[in-house]
Structures are given as structure tokens and as C-alpha cells.
Amino acid sequence: MLSQNIIDKIIRQDILVDELLDEELSIFCQTANLAYRSGKPIISNEDYDFIYLATLKNKEPNNPLFKSIEPEGRAFAEEKVLLPELMLSIDKAYSWNEMSKWIERLEKSGMLIGLDLNAIQIKATPKLDGFAGFDDGNRLYTRGDGKKGSDISRVFKRGLCVFKDSGRGLGAGEIVVKKSYFEKYLVHSFEYPRNFQSSLIKEKALDEQAQKAIIDKGALFVPFIKLPIWSGSMTELVAKFEEIVSQVLVMVDFDVDGVVFEVINIDLKTQMGANRKFHRWQIAFKENKDIVQVKVLNVMPQVGRSGKITPVAEVEPTLLSGATIVRVTGHHYGLVKEQGLGIGSVVELTRSGLVIPKIISVLKPMPVDIPDNCLSCGMPLVWESDFLVCVNHKNCPAQIIGRITYFFKVLANNDGFGIATVEKLYAHNIRSVSQIYTLNVERLMAIGFGEKTSINLISQLSRSISEKIEDWRFLAAFGMHRMGLGNCENLLKSYRLNDIFDLTLEQITNIDGFAELTAQVIVQGLVSIVDEYNQIYQYNFNLDTTVFTKDLQTLMHELFDKRIVFTGKMNCPRNEMKKHAKLVGIKVSTTISTKIDYLVIGSRVGQKKIQNAEKLGVVVMTEADYLSKITM
């Protein structure tokens, strides 16, 4: 057995994978797997799959860990019951080379039953990163060892719903939390979605966040048979493998850690069969992200508009996924302190596609420098959980400048008020958005702006007032904590903009989507902005009023409550069509997925976009078709 001290050193990478004996590596992989399945991961999925497990497989391909289903940990009841059906694990491939070997095995098995490679049909689904279970309609079981599992039917009694309101008894699936929901409501409380998912399953009483997630359908049981699929011939899979993987990975709003490929042909599935751990006709492709190791040159504190201090690591210029990386966020100072992120540290970075690079781990910890005072205003910093915060909200220059630039950025109907402009205004005693709206050309020129720039800035201020925007966007621009665009729109679906400052805690809590803790933050936020709001509102902004939910429910047309995406050049301005669609009870999105009901196309739309939409089950209609279904 490994001591806890040794395990901690491996986690911190004081001891690297190549320094472990084979037996130590095997024990650590088992320990990490148990922690993951108990909902308390000790290392990231990427590190487990691509560093530790990959090394173990290379050293000991016949290790028992690769021959049987991983145990699910001690978080579930000791008493196990027989599962209605076997729930095997899935074999994994981490490269095209490994996928090719699986395809070769399919071809050989096909030849034994007279099935040509081109006749083999394949389907692909997202590989969910949740808690596996089996729903027989009466009970829900954990996967356990694949034969016996624990009864966790309590999660349905707590109100957990099934994906797409599909009903019970659909067999194997996973308990997951929507990615968008986690990022909106839970990311500040849980490091990984799996930590939160485990709280839904355990026997202890649910906390407020778990109850809200169930009520909001942010957490769901997803039967595998209800997942969206790609299907096609083996020939097509080989020819378009990367494209298919990219397509399937974004099919659902859940954490996905790969793509599951499986044979459709029944006779071939029967021929290939299974071993003790997995079906031979099925495989999960898990793509390794680009990972580099780089030295940290400096760690600088950055003050956000809310006062949170973000550590920014300056690193040696490094090419990663086609981009040169010189700076990367350290997330918060709690992590800096815990991981030893300091000058001279060696860190592991990853970047997938166009995603912002992030630090996976600190390979070589160094002494850290935790600031005592705000870099901007000099006031002492305080700890709020894992975050260092400057509480000098009214007078901190960085926070003031951040709030002003945020206001104009969120309004999105103006140009010119970026950080350079606002910093110059601040240097001349401009401390609020309301003060900016009192400026004129002469004052701007006296501050040091040229005549042409001054005229343009005043023109942009006038534009921001006259150009129509949604009332919820106007409210969101004030930057209240937890009041982004979505929550502002939700609030204004129940109350008029000028009435919200008199709302009680109870009135906000009664709005669907706002728990008591969020309501408390909203009440405090409204108090903090009311004076500035009144100063700015007097300029009579051209605001589009949000339709109340109760009024939307009186609308009756074919597209009511449907999700649509507009694309291409429209006869009507596309932004106006989006706004009107919302006014008549249509849910407007910007990207195609299986959740979308209709794609409304104008001119100049690529055939590939239309084909992709149709593959996902999205109905395609022209602008004329759309207009005929609603009253414009």
C-alpha cells in the first residue's frame, strides 16, 4: 500500500510518473479511480487517462485494472443487488492508431460471417462524464461491478427528471449536470461537476444547490438510448473520422470526455461478443489535448471589477495548439497557495482548439508571493473562501475602470469606450458612467482628446441612448454580482425595470430560477446600484421592454416555446428578427445542436450547415416559411 504522504506527493507531482515502481503506479491508479467514482477526484481526467493509466498500460498491459470493471468506491451502500442486465465498461482508444486496430478486428469478425467492411454500419454518441446507472422503471441502480450495484432510487424520489422528459425504465444511462447550468450556478462552489453529481446520489439530505438543480432540470438522468447519434458506414467513419468526432463532442450540453463508437449490425455484434470487462463491438475514443510544460517567469495580481484578485502567470513564450502563449490565468490565489505557483515553477498547460489555455498542474512548486495589499489602490486584501478580494469597491481605481468599461461593453451599441479611453477619463477625475454622460466635446478636448475623437465619443454616447437595446441588457450593464444577461432577463419577465428596486426577498425567491441565496445577493446588488441607475436612467434610453412570462403564455402559434437559430442574410435585419422572436415566445439560440427545433435560413447559407442541421434532427425552414407561421 502507498502511504497518504506518498499519494499526496504523486498528486502534487513531487514524485513524477516515471519515478514510480510498477506496483506503486498500479496502486495509485486504483486509488485515483476509487476517488473519482466516489465523486471526489484527486487528479484530473486528463492526467488519469493520458499520464498515469497510459503509462500503466504500456508497462503492464495485463494489469487487473484493464481486465475488470473499476469498483465504484465506498460512497454507496455495502449491500449490492443483482442488476437487471449486465453493465460492462467500454474499451478505450486514445489515438487513430488504436481506433484502426479496433476497425481491423471488426473487419476480421465480419469476414467470418460473410460481412464486407463496407457493409458494417457504425453509430457514435457522446461519452458522458457522469454517474452510470440502470433504470428498470421501478429502481435505479449504480453500475457496481457490472453484475451487482447499489439501489439509489432515492434520486428519483427527490425529483430527478429523465432527459427529454422521456419517462422511466429506459435502461442504462448516467446522472449528469448540464454544463451550462454548472458554469452559471455551481462553478464557484465545486471544482468538478462530478463533485456536485455525487451530492445528488448520497444518502444525506440534499442541500439547497442540489435541490435547485433538480427543480431546474439542471441535473438529469440521461438514458443512453436517448442520446443524439451520428450513424453511417465504416467507409464514411474512416474518411471523416476527425469531423465526426468534432460533431459528436458538441451534441449535448453535458460534460463529455470522448465519443462512443459501436457496431449497429446485430449479427456482427453477436459474433464479436464480450469479455469480462467490455463489449468487443464497442469502443470509446478519448482524444488527448495538446499539453506542454513551461516555466513561470512571474505571477502578477490582476484586479477585477468586482474586487476579486486573479493571479496571472507570465510564462516563457510557448507554441500550444497553433498559438503562442505568454500569459495564463492561475484562477485564484487559493490555488496559487495550494499548488505552489510562483516564479520558477514548472507548470503543465493545455489548450484544446480555440479554448483559453489553462494550467492543469504545477509540476515544480516554488515559493509563492501572496499580495497583502491591492496593487491598484493599496488597501489591505481580505480572503473570501479561496479568493483574495479588495473590498474598497467605491474607490479602487481598477474596479471603477472595470465597471465603466463593462457597462459600455455589455450595452454593445457603442464604440470607443475601451480601457485606454476610460483610464484617461479616470485620470481626469471621471469616476462613474453617469459622469461620462455629462461630458461634452469641449470638456473632452480639455482632458486631452483630439477634436475628432471628442466629437466621435459624444456621438457614441448619443448612439448608446438612441439605439434600441433590451431592458435586461441595460440592467446587466450595471454589473451586479450573479446578474448576468440571463438572470436579468429572467427577473424582468416578472417585474418592470423601474419596479425591481422595491422588490422584497420573498418576491424574488418566488420567481422560477432564483433560490434564496441568489435572491439575497440580488437585493443587495440593487441597493448598491440604485443611485447610479437613477442618474443614468434619466437620459431616456431606448429600451425594449421584456414581455412578462404570464403574457407570453397567452400567445398561440406554431413556433411558441420552440428553439430556433437564424442564419444567412435575411430580408428583415437578423437582430430585429431575434428580438421579435423572443417577444412572441420563441427561444432564440446562436448555435446548432440537438436541442434546436428549427433552423431559419436566409440567403448565402452553405449547404454543409444545412446538412449538419438535418443530421441533428433540426427542421430547416426559409425566412418566408418562418414569417408565415407567426404574425410579424
UniProtKB/Swiss-Prot annotation:
Positions of NAD(+) binding: N45, E46, D47, Y48, D49, S89, I90, R143, E174, K286
Highest taxon of the lineage: Bacteria
Record-level GO BP terms: DNA repair; DNA replication
SMART domains xrefs: LIGANc
Cofactor(s) listed: Mg(2+); Mn(2+)
UniProt keyword terms in alphabetical order: DNA damage, DNA repair, DNA replication, Ligase, Magnesium, Manganese, Metal-binding, NAD, Zinc
A Pfam match: DNA_ligase_OB
Catalysed reactions, as listed in the record: NAD(+) + (deoxyribonucleotide)n-3'-hydroxyl + 5'-phospho-(deoxyribonucleotide)m = (deoxyribonucleotide)n+m + AMP + beta-nicotinamide D-nucleotide
CDD domains attached to this UniProt entry: BRCT_DNA_ligase_like (cd17748)
Listed EC numbers: 6.5.1.2
Catalytic center residues: K127 (n6-amp-lysine intermediate)
Top EC class for this record: ligase
Domain BRCT as annotated: residue spans: 561-632
Entry keyword NAD: yes
Gene Ontology MF annotations: DNA ligase (NAD+) activity; metal ion binding
Family note: Belongs to the NAD-dependent DNA ligase family. LigA subfamily.
Cited function: DNA ligase that catalyzes the formation of phosphodiester linkages between 5'-phosphoryl and 3'-hydroxyl groups in double-stranded DNA using NAD as a coenzyme and as the energy source for the reaction. It is essential for DNA replication and repair of damaged DNA.
Protein known as: DNA ligase
Origin organism lineage: Bacteria, Pseudomonadati, Pseudomonadota, Gammaproteobacteria, Candidatus Pseudothioglobaceae
Gene (name only): ligA
